[in-house]
């Protein structure tokens, strides 16, 4: 069973992008390969409970358990030793990825305070898109009363697009609300 976004991609987006960019094969059409959610937790050095709460939040948002990222090397200025847990990360692919993107675009983004659209300039030059979320409470799975602190997260959308223009057209076809 495919999700709403998967069906939309196969039925409408592929045809639109072929006419817009003149691809010769269906396999040339850019597609989203993975979505990575990353939460950096610098304040977890002092309190170990922060990691548990962040992992719980990411699990609710993503629908799968994140991996705890550890410090690669010691940095005395930040009071970090090698191997310290300093973040949490989860990679979504396939059906879970499309379900997350659907919830993100239709439910979470409109709940952002003073939302005027997302920047169209956050592409990396190779067709991938990054967006930072300041508060995890924009996701409906997170209950406002049960959180201990407001935490932001970075969402990286990796595509097979060769250029930023192709990637922007792909994400715009998925109803991403770009402001420029």
Swiss-Prot record:
One of its GO terms (biological process) is translation. Keywords: Ribonucleoprotein, Ribosomal protein, RNA-binding, rRNA-binding, tRNA-binding. InterPro entries: Ribosomal_uL5 (IPR002132), Ribosomal_uL5_bac-type (IPR020930), Ribosomal_uL5_C (IPR031309), Ribosomal_uL5_CS (IPR020929), Ribosomal_uL5_dom_sf (IPR022803), Ribosomal_uL5_N (IPR031310). One of its GO terms (cellular component) is ribonucleoprotein complex. It comes from the Bacteria. One of its GO terms (molecular function) is rRNA binding. This is one of the proteins that bind and probably mediate the attachment of the 5S RNA into the large ribosomal subunit, where it forms part of the central protuberance. In the 70S ribosome it contacts protein S13 of the 30S subunit (bridge B1b), connecting the 2 subunits; this bridge is implicated in subunit movement. Contacts the P site tRNA; the 5S rRNA and some of its associated proteins might help stabilize positioning of ribosome-bound tRNAs. Part of the 50S ribosomal subunit; part of the 5S rRNA/L5/L18/L25 subcomplex. Contacts the 5S rRNA and the P site tRNA. Forms a bridge to the 30S subunit in the 70S ribosome. Belongs to the universal ribosomal protein uL5 family. NCBIfam families: PRK00010.1. This is Large ribosomal subunit protein uL5. It comes from Polynucleobacter asymbioticus (strain DSM 18221 / CIP 109841 / QLW-P1DMWA-1).
């Amino acid at each position: 069973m495919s999700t709403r976004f998967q069906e939309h991609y196969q039925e409408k987006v592929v045809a639109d992008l072929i006419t817009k960019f003149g691809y010769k094969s269906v396999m040339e059409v850019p597609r989203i390969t993975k979505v990575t959610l990353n939460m950096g937790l610098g304040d977890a050095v002092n309190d170990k409970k922060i990691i548990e709460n962040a992992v719980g939040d990411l699990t609710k948002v993503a629908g799968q358990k994140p991996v705890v990222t550890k410090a690669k090397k010691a940095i005395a200025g930040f009071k970090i030793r090698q191997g310290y847990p300093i973040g949490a990360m989860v990679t979504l692919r396939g059906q879970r990825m499309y379900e997350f993107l659907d919830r993100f675009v239709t439910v979470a983004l409109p709940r952002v305070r003073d939302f005027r659209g997302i920047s169209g300039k956050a592409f990396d030059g190779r067709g991938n898109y990054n967006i930072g979320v300041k508060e995890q409470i924009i996701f409906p799975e997170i209950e406002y009363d049960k959180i201990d602190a407001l935490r932001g997260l970075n969402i990286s959308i990796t595509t097979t697009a060769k250029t930023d223009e192709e990637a922007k057209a792909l994400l715009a076809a998925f109803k991403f609300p770009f402001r420029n």
